[in-house]
Structure formats: C-alpha cells, structure tokens
Amino acid sequence: MTISLVAAGLYFLSRQAAPSEHYKRVVALFHSFAATGLLAFLAWYEYPNGWLAPIWAAFALVLAIADQRLKLQELPWQSHALAAITLVRAVSVNLYFTLSWHGFSVRLLSLAVVAVIFYALSRLIRMPDEWRQLDLHHVYSWAASVIVSLLLWYELQPLSIAVGWAVFGLVLFEYGILRKIAQFRYQAYVALLAAFARIFFANLTAGEPGEFWGPRMYTILPLALILYFVYAQLPQKEENVARDRRLHFDTLVAYLGTATIVALFYFQFPIEWVVVSWAALVFALLGAALALDKPLFLQQGMLLTLMVFSRGMAHNLFGASYFGESDWKGNYLAVSAASAMLLASLAFAFRLRGRFQLGLNGSRLTRLVHAAMRRPEQLVFFVPVLLVTFMLALKMKTGLITVSWGIEAVLVFMLAFAVKETSFRRTGLGLLLVCVGKIAALDFWGLQIRDKYITLIVVGIALTFVSFLYTRYGDTIRQYL
C-alpha cells in the first residue's frame, strides 16, 4: 500500500510540470519513470511466480491505453520497457514453469495472456508515424507469435507440434488477409516453414513400418492441406499481397505443400514402391496444372518427373548394393508401374503443351527450363522409356534383351503414330536401329543358336511391321510428321 501511494504521488507530481519548462519537464519525467519502476518492483515483490509476466504485460497495456488519452511522451517508453522485461521474464521463467492453477497449466495461462496483450500493444501503443510506416510496431506482434510458438512447443506432444504450428500459421495468415496486414502473413509463412521443418525431426519416422493410417499420416497430411489452402487463399490481383508474390511466398508455400507429400510418400510406402507413389503424384500435379491453369504445378510435376527418374535409376535399377548381391534384385513391377503412370500423364502433358506464356529472355538455364515447360510431353515420355529400356537390359536374360528392346521399339512407334509426335517416332526407330546394331556387333557372334534365331525373327518382324506402317500410312505420317 505504501509503495502504491508513493507511486501515485510521483505520477501526480509529474503532471504538474508545464511542457514549456524544460528543467521541470525533466524532473517530471524522472517522477513518472520512478513511479512506474516502483509499481513494477512491487509486482515482482508480491508475485515472484508465474503470474509476474502477465502482470507486467497488463501494466504496459494500461500505460499504452492511458497514453491514448493523455499523449505523454514518457508513457510509450515506459510501456516499451515493461514489455521488454515481460518478454525476458516469459522466455526465461514462464516457459519452464510446470505448476498448475485449478487444474490449468500456469505456463499456458500466463503466456497466453502475455501474447494477447502483446498483440494488443502492436495496435494501441503510440509511435511516430514514420516508425509505423516501417512496421516497427509489429515488433510486438512478432514477439507475441514467438511466445505462442514456444508455448505450443512446450505444451503439445512432440508429434502434435508441427500440426499446432501449421494451424497457428493458418490463423495468422487468415487474419493478415482479412485485415490486410502484411506482417501477420509473414509471421504465418515463418510458422508454416517451421512446421514443415519439424516433420523431418519427429513426424516422418513415427508409427510402425507398413502402417497406412497412423501418426505419420494423420499428423503430416493436415500440414500439406493447410499449405495448399494458404496458397489457394492468396488473391491473384490484390495490391496488399503484391509484395508477397514479388517475394515468391506463394511459390514457397505451394512447393512446401508438394514437398510435404513427397516426403510423406517416401516414408509411408515400401522402399521399392516409392518411385510409383511419386509417379502417381506427377499425374496429380499435371492434372492440377491443367484444371487450375497454374504453371507452378507444371513446374513441380516436371521436377518430380526428374526425381522419379533419379530414384528409379539410382535405387530400383542400380541399387543392387542395397540387397547385398551383385545382380539386380529390385521389383521390376515397381518400375513398370511407375513408367505406366508417367505415360498416362501424357494425357495431361499434351494438353499443357504451349499453354502458358513463358519469357524467352534470361540466362541459358532459364531459357532451357522454359523450353522444357513449353513441351512437357517430351520429358514425361523419355523418362519412362529410359527406365523401361534400362530395366529390360538388367532384368531380361542375355539372349532376350534385344528381343525385348525390339518389342519396346514397336510399342513406342505405335504410341508415336497414335499421338502424332515426331520425337516419339524417332525414338522407336532409334531403338530398332540399336537392336540391329546389337545383333550385328554382339548377338550374332555370342548367343546360342536358339536365342540367335529368336532374336532375328522378333527383330525382323518388328522391322517388317514398322515398314508396313510406313507403306500403308505413308501419306498420313508425312502430314503430321
């Protein structure tokens, strides 16, 4: 009581100085700061526990509200000082406070109050206009978001932290969109990025091997949905999100969503079938690019196609060391299924050809990427053809490799005839020429009699069939080729 009365007296004395009297004003400032310091010290003395931080935060809020009416230059600085010591107290003491109050966590209640007050201070505390134009008042909202994120870290179970951060990021993003406040959206992007990083340390390895619906699935799938939802919520032409797009936050969020699913599939499916799941995702991405008219999903689909090729070659085909033997023991059905899925994606890739207007300027790499995106069917075709070609070379017996390549060449040529694509036709012819060259250089001299005759017969039939197609449909072929 005594300290409270002294503080009240000091506040009263500080109000008696005229603003024009410089020395009296300095003394008045001293009185005001002394009063605030006494009350802050009193709170520390009376409540040296988990409730001190919210008391200091509430005191800072009261000073900010009083300053809205009184317009005293010292009150905002006192609020800043109280907020600073509140933040230090919250991070150094309250985060590690484990006691309960009426069955509720003191840490949860106290830090929630501090965070709410900090969000309020970002709006109420008085600052010079030039400071607000620089968004310096959002130091408080950033501090509040950090407190909430740390609170979620300590209060939630390890597997729930990523989901908690993602939901928190979604709330911040929606508020930033609703109120057109960029800083809240930036905080949302940081929270979503942190949630994405978190799954690599806890969620992806959760659950039992082979378990389809388990902790891994139901904690990571919501994150991917939230990331895609945030991407879809970004308006295309509104000025207040122009900077978000200029900084490519929309691209970042969309790529994080796809990367989340890619990582989930890597840990969710048996190691041999990862390549198939990724190929299915390519199909979905190209379909989304066509349905939503978004070149971003086309980029992701083509990038993932390259990942399918790398995974198929490095693990499924040439990953014999994983199985402890020199011969290939991988599942040929997995590579075949992945290749079939990519070939099915041609239905979307052809319709995406030349659909998006891409710049012709830039570096050589940029021009190469844009050229590939203008003709996505080329990459989507050649990747499965190469995978199947290498798979046949590794899987088939020595005497049947050329035979299998000849059959593949005929199928490729028939596909080229069906879709009317020159590069596909040339690929089929190239495979046939490879078969002829292999027969002349290796098979004729090294195969057994039976395998030699089978190879010659099958390749001869393939050449005859292709020649028949050229003769029978020569005019049609010349029209579109």
Labelled PLM ranges:
Residues 1-481:
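Alpha-helical transmembrane segments of multi-pass membrane proteins
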